[in-house]
Amino acid sequence: MAALGPSSQNVTEYVVRVPKNTTKKYNIMAFNAADKVNLTTWNQARLERDLSNKKIYQEEEMPESGAGSEFNRKLREEARRKKYGIVLKEFRPEDQPWLLRVNGKSGRKFKGIKKGGVTENTSYYIFTQCPDGAFEAFPVHNWYNFTPLAKHRTLTAEEAEEEWERRNKVLNHFSIMQQRRLKDQDQDEEDEEKEKRSRKKASELRIHDLEDDLEMSSDDSEASGEEGGRAPKAKKKAPPSKGGRKKKKKKGSDDEAFEDSDDGDFEGQEVDYMSDGSSSSQDELEGKPKATQQEEGPKGVDEQSESSEESEEEKPPEEDKEEEEEKKAPTPQEKKRRKDSSEESDSSEESDIDSEASSALFMAKKKTPPKRERKPSGGSSRGNSRPGTPSTEAGSTSSTLRAAASKLEQGKRTSETPAAKRLRLDTGPQSLSGKSTPQPQSGKSTPSSGDVQVTEDAVRRYLTRKPMTTKDLLKKFQTKKTGLSSEQTVNVLAQILKRLNPERKMINDKMHFSLKE
């Protein structure tokens, strides 16, 4: 063999002998560089075949004769294999992997797997130099790649499958727990938001039995509480001879009752207490004493009228003077308050109409002097308060009522609505006739036309409360309450919705309108 170099003059030749018959077979052991194998540190090495796969290639040993044997079993098995093309592989020990143990039990272990196809297209030779300087070349039969074995115990296929199923269960458990935690966090956040909203809107919280009751806002509920809460308050009225401080306490307690009351709470009682109870509660709210019970016309309950008249008879003259002063003072404030409330919402306007109609009559009665005429005769007033007996003073009192009502009508034409005028005129013939069957004056149980008006404020209030469809809005403004036809109501609602331009959302395939506060 010639050594290639810069100059062709220096040539060295070697003799290579290839033996024809060799008893030895040479194999190559390949180690990975990352394993950092150093042969100089090996003190002891043991190499053996791994024959653990021998059981796979073994056939089941069946008896050829005697008990449990089959006739021509081997022939039938061979015929079946030929039919399906099954070729049995023989167990060859030379094809099995090598096990290499270095430095005893405490050392490393390697497993050498035969690499196939290495000697198909190439021939590898191992050169060994002889003492005479010649080289002997031995062909390589097999190539083995050695990899280190892990010292820890590994799982079998069945154990690995069981662990894999367990892994899925564990992962599913973790995912379920994580979902629960996320749900709990979301619920906590929602609860915190609800608490914040409830703190901000604590005054607006109302509990309603029916959907139609939601039409009344917090202001409306107070106004309706004034009308509906008048009946029970008349019975609870204490004798007014105890001074002005108790009156102030009464006012505070009445306000609390108005906040809790709602529309329709006293419908069953309002017929019995319409004429008497409403007037007494109205007088208490305005800070005015109660007028004569006889002038009011029909009485609801006899005991109420008697108790109220007795309490009025017991009043000293000093309190009469104070009450006369109180009568004159709050009238402009009442007008101002009624105007403001009528501008705020339609529902509050309805309650103001009722209160104006009743207060106009009672103010007229209080300005007339029959109160002093009635004082000396306590028994006669008690007798006249009976609902069945006609009163002799009814004609004079009704004429004074009409005169006072006409004066008030001229002063309040600008602020009063036609409904209030109609209510006031209707109370005139009622006061004349001393019948025992009371007529509802407030129009609460039998709604008249025009009680509810389709306004922009009302629609805005409903839409800010919750998303609503046009059908829901039409239910809120019924033709019986508004006094309009269905076509007119639809047109007015369409114009108001155009002006408000609310947000549109599709909920359950239905268009819902809503407004933000």
UniProtKB/Swiss-Prot annotation:
Residues 210-225, 255-270, 303-325, 343-355 have a biased composition (Acidic residues). One of its GO terms (biological process) is transcription elongation by RNA polymerase II. The keyword Transit peptide does not apply. Residues 232-251, 364-374 have a biased composition (Basic residues). Keywords: Acetylation, DNA-binding, Nucleus, Phosphoprotein, Transcription, Transcription regulation. InterPro entries: TFIIF-alpha, TFIIF_interaction, WH-like_DNA-bd_sf, WH_DNA-bd_sf. It comes from Bos taurus. Its main location: nucleus. The gene is GTF2F1. Transmembrane segments: none annotated. Phosphorylated on Ser and other residues by TAF1 and casein kinase II-like kinases. Heterodimer of an alpha and a beta subunit. Interacts with GTF2F2, CTDP1, TAF6/TAFII80 and URI1. Interacts with GTF2B (via C-terminus and preferentially via acetylated form); this interaction prevents binding of GTF2B to GTF2F2. GO terms for molecular function: DNA binding; phosphatase activator activity; promoter-specific chromatin binding; protein domain specific binding; protein phosphatase binding; RNA polymerase II general transcription initiation factor activity; TFIIF-class transcription factor complex binding. It holds the Pfam family TFIIF_alpha. TFIIF is a general transcription initiation factor that binds to RNA polymerase II and helps to recruit it to the initiation complex in collaboration with TFIIB. It promotes transcription elongation. The modification Phosphoserine is found at S217, S218, S221, S224, S377, S380, S381, S385, S391, S431, S433, S436, S449. Signal peptide: none annotated. PANTHER family: GENERAL TRANSCRIPTION FACTOR IIF SUBUNIT 1, TFIIF-ALPHA. The modification N6-acetyllysine is found at K407. It comes from the Eukaryota. Residues 392-401, 428-452 have a biased composition (Polar residues). The lineage of its organism: Eukaryota, Metazoa, Chordata, Craniata, Vertebrata. This is General transcription factor IIF subunit 1.
